[in-house]
């Protein structure tokens, strides 16, 4: 059974969440038989140092293979939070194509870290995911077009602009 500490770094109702509180919830879900613990920044207020502190608490109770990260990009910290998580050994993350998503009970919260940004980071670190970045960028452009919005992925937007600049000009 998978469980999550959904507001491990900040709560829209109580504000900041301490590492002690995260560990208390992690212990409780472990006691009821949850075998995978997601550490989530659902409203996107986490920073790398605080993410590492929360993860270190979860990793006291679960092996690294049973802990995952879920980071929204409200304040532009999601990719830094993924990197900070990698530094403590995490290797499982939730991400969303084109950075889609949000949080209905947290005004202004954006979607999860964009899959394209995570793939670019991992590739830059020499980590082979077996996932085609170009394919994900194409998928993000398609779904964003259907939704009538621009992708929020910095990587996706940069690669789309690079492709457009490299395309031969149309003759008139």
Regions found by a protein language model. Name each.
Residues 1-172:
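Catalytic cores and adjacent flexible loops of soluble metabolic enzymes
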